[in-house]
Amino acid sequence: MKYIQVENLLTPTYLSRLFDQVKGMNGFPWYFLSDDVSYSTNGFMFGDTKLLDMPEDEKAIGFTHVLLDQEGVESPWLSHWLPVLDSVQDALPCPVQFLRVRLALQLNNGKMHHNAPHTDSEKDHYAALFYLHDCTGDTVFFDQYDDPNSGLNIDERWYKGRTQSYTERLRVKPEANKLFVFDGHQYHASSNPNGEHKFRVALNLNFLSDDDIFAAKV
């Protein structure tokens, strides 16, 4: 599995400012997701099977805030986060185009199990996670890969992703100011915080590049 990990992406002062923004009573809006905070569970049928239905122990209700996406969504709070996007670009070896940028807030639900394995999109893309604070709730990566050249159509790929068995490959611990970039076809899953940690906030990014960012030299 190829990935890029960057420590101390932002200055400590700016990181603290962003974290205070999303955790305080200062008007920053969070939007409740009653199904699962990992991805949308609407639609996606394969025969009589709802492709994105998931076991109860893999569901994780939570909150989200979309800062930017392909559908034209641009949050009025985006300007506060543009320095993060600039820093991500500066940390990578080639130009990128951001497709979606969203914040996810997960709560301690008492469960130790990871959430549903998934990819953010069936299309070619890169994905990244930026952690705003130290907490429990590892991001789990699996050996399984959604190969776009497998010969399966999109519905078949989704069905395979929902029904196949998964073997754990790597865990990434949420640590303040850490960026973790990976192939968007790699199956992964979030975990809710546990123990003394009551919440977990991470920035999720999806982007394109004309170059192979793992082959290019930084």
At which residue positions do the language-model features occur?
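Non-heme Fe(II)/2-oxoglutarate
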Residues: M1-P95
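Catalytic core of non-heme Fe(II) oxygenases with the double-stranded beta-helix
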Residues: E74-V218
